[in-house]
């Protein structure tokens, strides 16, 4: 838990703390407020997102870690990380403001430093708030026979209820 404070401290050192001031501004302005690169357009998975997302691999050996950035209003479809043993995903918010929601539960707001552990088999989605850029580290939890099942889009009737 104390290690996560390093992300918040690094952000304070390398930015002027104005992440909220670029909430719905340009990608270039937002990129200056986070400590990981935004990366490239997430074309490979675009069909599973509403809006534009970007990915930047942070760790490629061992346990994969990717920085995923969502433009304001962008979210991924409902999906499930599957595994026969272990598996799942951990999200660590590193910039902006976003949401995570499990099927049948209320959405959880995510801000820099917040972390969510998603066990294998849990239907969920995550993405940016309607008025803010959002970045999180996506950490694949080691497991056996890991896969992701992509499901239906998060409809406007669900997304429009976010505050």
Describe the function of each predicted region.
Residues 69-70, 82, 94-97, 104, ...:
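A mature extracytoplasmic/lumenal domain signature
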Residues 57, 77-83, 102, 109, ...:
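Short histidine-centered beta-strand/loop micro-motifs
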Residues 4-10, 14-66, 77, 147-163:
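A short, N-terminal "cap"/entry segment at the start of jelly-roll beta-barrel domains
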């Amino acid at each position: 838990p104390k290690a996560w404070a390093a992300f918040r401290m690094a952000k304070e050192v390398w930015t002027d703390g104005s992440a909220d001031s670029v909430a719905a501004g340009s990608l270039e302005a937002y990129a200056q407020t986070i400590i990981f690169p935004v990366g490239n357009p997430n074309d490979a998975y675009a069909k599973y997102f509403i809006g534009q997302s970007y990915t930047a691999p942070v760790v490629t050996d061992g346990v994969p870690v990717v920085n995923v950035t969502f433009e304001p209003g962008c979210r991924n479809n409902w999906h499930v990380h599957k595994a026969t043993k272990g598996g799942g995903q951990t999200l660590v918010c590193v910039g902006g403001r976003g949401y995570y929601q499990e099927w049948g539960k209320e959405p959880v707001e995510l801000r820099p430093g917040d972390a969510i552990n998603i066990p294998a088999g849990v239907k969920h989605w995550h993405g940016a708030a309607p008025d803010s850029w959002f970045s999180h580290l996506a950490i694949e939890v080691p497991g056996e026979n890991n896969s992701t099942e992509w499901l239906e889009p998060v409809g406007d009737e669900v997304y429009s209820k976010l505050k």
